[in-house]
Design a protein with these regions (language model features):
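Zinc-dependent deaminase
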Residues: 1-19, 65, 81-147
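Short loop/turn microsegments at loop-to-beta-strand junctions
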Residues: 22-24, 70
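Short beta-strand scaffold segments in enzyme catalytic cores
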Residues: 24-32
């Protein structure tokens, strides 16, 4: 089931890619149903906070901001801002595709959702469909450098 939802997140990431955004996509699932889908819109919206995770959290929060019964699927390991937002939303679980060795905050640089200093902890699993997620990111940056 995880792979099915990560494939949807990858569809969102492709939308970002096609519109010149860093290709990150996110899907929030509750009880086996998709309740939110989003992709990066930082360039489009001229908003540094318009990361896929933030947009998906906002959509999903319309049914209530506590998301302990939700799983977030995202194509790239969340950054510090998004990891903090996931904690504040009390997300139940996070599954991500590619690791982010430079600013990933669910295991690569730091593990925000595993830190007992914060109120909410949640499991996070990385590497699902990692190859596909990483290749899309690499294609984006190769294209960007070529422009």
């Amino acid at each position: 089931m995880d792979k099915k939802f990560m494939a949807l997140a990858l569809e969102e990431a492709r939308k970002a890619f096609d519109s010149g955004e860093v290709p990150v996509g996110a899907v929030v699932v509750r009880d086996g149903q998709v309740v939110a889908r989003a992709h990066n819109l930082r360039e489009t919206d001229k908003d540094p906070l318009a990361h896929a995770e933030m947009l998906a959290i906002r959509q999903a929060a319309k049914d209530g901001w506590r998301m302990r019964d939700c799983t977030l699927y995202v194509t790239l390991e969340p950054c510090p801002m998004c990891a903090g937002a996931l904690s504040m939303a009390q997300i139940g679980r996070v599954v991500f595709g590619a690791f982010d060795e430079k600013q990933g905050c669910l295991g690569s640089v730091y593990h925000f959702l595993a830190d007992p200093a914060f109120y909410h902890q949640a499991p996070a699993e990385g590497g699902l469909m990692e190859k596909e997620c990483r290749e899309l990111m690499q294609r984006f940056f190769e294209r960007r450098r070529g422009d």
